[in-house]
């Protein structure tokens, strides 16, 4: 039964438009996992998604004049192995920026 508990894993997926804010959040999560004696692997960078929007510059004619805007979504994965109850409580109380989307799987 103890081997089943040792094989437990928490997978945290993080998404953000700002890469620096995402890296700071990853550092906070890894630091929290290390202080509670859990093993953290990551952050593993995933491919960045680029979404490009094409907009007409003029409100009337001039279809040849266009402007491009893009959003980049940076993504990371962190795996936490053998989490304890303290680890889960510490991760729940962790204060992360609002610009970072967090998805947790047990």
Curated annotation (Swiss-Prot):
This is Small ribosomal subunit protein uS10. Involved in the binding of tRNA to the ribosomes. Disulfide bonds: none annotated. Part of the 30S ribosomal subunit. GO terms for molecular function: structural constituent of ribosome; tRNA binding. Keywords: Ribonucleoprotein, Ribosomal protein. The keyword Ribonucleoprotein applies. SUPFAM superfamilies: Ribosomal protein S10 (SSF54999). InterPro entries: Ribosomal_uS10, Ribosomal_uS10_dom, Ribosomal_uS10_dom_sf. It comes from Synechococcus sp. (strain WH7803). The lineage of its organism: Bacteria, Bacillati, Cyanobacteriota, Cyanophyceae, Synechococcales. One of its GO terms (cellular component) is ribonucleoprotein complex. GO terms for biological process: translation. It comes from the Bacteria. It holds the Pfam family Ribosomal_S10. Belongs to the universal ribosomal protein uS10 family.
